[in-house]
Structures are given as C-alpha cells and as structure tokens.
Amino acid sequence: MSSRPGVDQRFLDAYRLRKTDEYSSVFAFRRAFKGRFFIAHYRPNELGTARLGVVIAKKLAKRANVRNLLKRIVREQFRKARPALAHHDLVVRLHVPVKMATRAMINDDVVNLLGRFRE
C-alpha cells in the first residue's frame, strides 16, 4: 500500500476509539470478520472517517512488550489503509495466542482484515 499524494497519513486522535461507550457500541453491533490471529468487530459511523480501537488481552499475550508490538502493528497498518477504508468504527481484538507467529504473519493477517473494509 503506497501513500497517495495529498492524503494525510498521520494517526490522529480523531481516528481512535477512546471511550468505553465507543467500544461497547461496536461490540453490541455484533458484526465481525475473523482472521488467523485477530477478529475485527465493526460498526458503521457517520463521522466521515474510519476509527480504530485495539484490544490485546493479557491472557493471550502475557508479556507487555508483545502486547505493545501487536498494538503498534495494528495501528500502523490502519494508518496506511485508513484513507481507503469505509466509514466504520473498528475494534481489532486478538483471539488466539501468537507464540509461534512471525511479524510477517501478523502483518498479513491485519492487512487482510482491513482489506475487507475498503470502499
């Protein structure tokens, strides 16, 4: 995914889910796509842009550095894909342990999940 000229590629606060109610409304909508490691829960929004929340449970990724790495990977792939995504609130949630996964496998899973939300 290359950047397009004139498209803001930053990951601003406006593109993040922050509040518990925002996460709850996405989970309550009960729509999701499942990948190899992650599940992407989604809900359409009227804000004119896609927003992201990331949930990495300690039960599935015991070490903080692994949880932080997974969140960085998801945020980076979202940042790159956001201009082409439909206007949804997304919560990307880890659903299986990633002990034997490579960084490339995780990246591919996130890219494939986000690809389902292209306009």
From Swiss-Prot:
<comment type="function">
    <text>RNaseP catalyzes the removal of the 5'-leader sequence from pre-tRNA to produce the mature 5'-terminus. It can also cleave other RNA substrates such as 4.5S RNA. The protein component plays an auxiliary but essential role in vivo by binding to the 5'-leader sequence and broadening the substrate specificity of the ribozyme.</text>
</comment>
<dbReference type="InterPro" id="IPR020539">
    <property type="entry name" value="RNase_P_CS"/>
</dbReference>
<keyword id="KW-0255">Endonuclease</keyword>
<dbReference type="GO" id="GO:0001682">
    <property type="term" value="P:tRNA 5'-leader removal"/>
</dbReference>
<comment type="similarity">
    <text>Belongs to the RnpA family.</text>
</comment>
<dbReference type="InterPro" id="IPR014721">
    <property type="entry name" value="Ribsml_uS5_D2-typ_fold_subgr"/>
</dbReference>
<dbReference type="GO" id="GO:0030677">
    <property type="term" value="C:ribonuclease P complex"/>
</dbReference>
<keyword id="KW-0378">Hydrolase</keyword>
<keyword id="KW-0694">RNA-binding</keyword>
<dbReference type="InterPro" id="IPR020568">
    <property type="entry name" value="Ribosomal_Su5_D2-typ_SF"/>
</dbReference>
<dbReference type="GO" id="GO:0000049">
    <property type="term" value="F:tRNA binding"/>
</dbReference>
<keyword id="KW-0540">Nuclease</keyword>
<keyword id="KW-0819">tRNA processing</keyword>
<dbReference type="GO" id="GO:0042781">
    <property type="term" value="F:3'-tRNA processing endoribonuclease activity"/>
</dbReference>
<dbReference type="Pfam" id="PF00825">
    <property type="entry name" value="Ribonuclease_P"/>
</dbReference>
<dbReference type="GO" id="GO:0004526">
    <property type="term" value="F:ribonuclease P activity"/>
</dbReference>
<dbReference type="InterPro" id="IPR000100">
    <property type="entry name" value="RNase_P"/>
</dbReference>
<protein>
    <recommendedName>
        <fullName>Ribonuclease P protein component</fullName>
        <ecNumber>3.1.26.5</ecNumber>
    </recommendedName>
</protein>
<comment type="subunit">
    <text>Consists of a catalytic RNA component (M1 or rnpB) and a protein subunit.</text>
</comment>
